[in-house]
């Protein structure tokens, strides 16, 4: 009996020793594998960094990272070693996301990541207080973070052709230096309140959205000189549009406008308008032009057309007041 106990104890002791050895061996193998993976990562990071350094150029005194038509679905953390960069230009790289560490590039002035497959903008973007231009057109972005409003130096923001953006956070009205905004080819049904309240905005493109009407408060954009609203579903224009005294270019082609408000003749600075492809209820034609075919084409639904339309609209209104029932359908001065 005693011999059996001793034998069992010896076996257990040997088993325990072997289990410890096996456990230690597995731990050593795991550490070695992790170390090898770490070496591979370090090597890959160094290779990536070398490749990235080859893409750095200097133009007009700026340090620029320029990559085009090369596959970079993600950007390595080794990029942080190039924190002196002032401009990124990454086009058609298949980039899936803006790195979370983007906020550490405090010298960035221009961030151009257009024509990629980016689906979101990280909140860290708000740390780029020197950023003047953010160009993210032709991506797959759906929402814009409120933190973007912290980019106090931002002057130009382009989010065109993301298809699904339908609103902007109200905080973006705090972008006091923003003068240029491109929201074309998205999913907006109205002009966001944030846009209406941007104090310095001069140039706005909301073409190819789903706008049905313009708010009366559009007159708030007193510094706006260019407004693109082509290819929407706008049915009428507010009377307050005539209060936009600095507006020089207004494009309203391919909408559902049935009339041109008379008050628009008060817009003294208006130099270019386009009402082409709208179901306007009055049919008016212009006198023959002595200009080139290009000029004639441009003016066919342009400023002269607008003034002629308004004159005809006013003339018809006067006739109705005077009780006349025989009115011409159109103005035609072809001789």
UniProtKB/Swiss-Prot annotation:
Transmembrane annotation, as ranges: none
Localisation per UniProt entry: Cytoplasm, Myofibril, Sarcomere, M line
Domain of life assignment: Eukaryota
GO CC terms: M band
Mapped LRR repeat ranges: 84-105, 107-128, 130-151, 153-176, 177-197, 200-221, 223-244, 246-267, 269-290
Keywords: Coiled coil, Cytoplasm, Leucine-rich repeat, Muscle protein, Repeat
Tissue expression pattern: Highly expressed in skeletal muscle and heart. Not detected in other tissues tested.
Main location: cytoplasm
Subunit field text: Interacts with MYH7 (via C-terminus).
Entry function: Component of the sarcomeric M-band which plays a role in myocyte response to biomechanical stress. May regulate expression of other M-band proteins via an SRF-dependent pathway. Important for normal contractile function in heart.
Name by which UniProt lists this protein: Leucine-rich repeat-containing protein 39
Taxonomic lineage: Eukaryota, Metazoa, Chordata, Craniata, Vertebrata
């Amino acid at each position: 009996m005693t011999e059996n106990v001793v034998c069992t104890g010896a076996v257990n002791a040997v088993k325990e020793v072997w289990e410890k050895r096996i456990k230690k061996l597995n731990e050593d193998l795991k550490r070695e594998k992790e170390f090898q993976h770490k070496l591979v990562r370090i090597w890959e990071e160094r290779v990536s960094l070398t490749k990235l350094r080859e893409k750095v150029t200097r133009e007009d005194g700026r340090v620029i990272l320029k990559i085009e038509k090369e596959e970079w679905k993600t950007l390595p953390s080794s990029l942080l070693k190039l924190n002196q960069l002032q401009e990124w230009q990454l086009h058609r790289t298949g980039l899936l996301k803006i790195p979370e560490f983007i906020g550490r590039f405090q010298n960035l002035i221009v961030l151009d990541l257009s024509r990629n497959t980016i689906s979101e903008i990280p909140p860290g973007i708000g740390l780029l207080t020197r950023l003047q231009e953010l160009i993210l057109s032709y991506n797959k972005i759906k929402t814009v973070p409120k933190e973007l409003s912290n980019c106090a130096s931002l002057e130009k923001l382009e989010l065109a052709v993301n298809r699904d953006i339908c609103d902007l956070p109200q905080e973006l009205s705090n972008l006091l230096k923003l003068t240029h905004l491109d929201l074309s080819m998205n999913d907006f049904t109205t002009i966001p309140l944030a846009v209406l309240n941007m104090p310095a905005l001069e140039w706005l493109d909301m073409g190819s959205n789903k706008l049905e009407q313009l708010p009366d408060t559009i007159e708030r954009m007193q510094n706006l000189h260019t407004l693109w609203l082509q290819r929407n579903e706008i049915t009428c224009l507010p009377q307050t549009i005539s209060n936009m005294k600095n507006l020089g270019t207004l494009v309203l082609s391919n909408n559902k406008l049935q009339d041109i408000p008379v008050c628009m003749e008060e817009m003294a600075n208006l130099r270019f308008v386009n009402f082409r492809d709208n179901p306007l209820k009055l049919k008016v034609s212009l006198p023959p032009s002595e200009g080139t075919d290009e000029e004639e084409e441009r003016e066919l639904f342009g400023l002269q057309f607008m003034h002629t339309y308004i004159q005809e609209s006013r003339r018809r209104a006067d006739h109705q007041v005077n009780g006349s029932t025989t009115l011409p359908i159109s103005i035609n001065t072809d001789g």
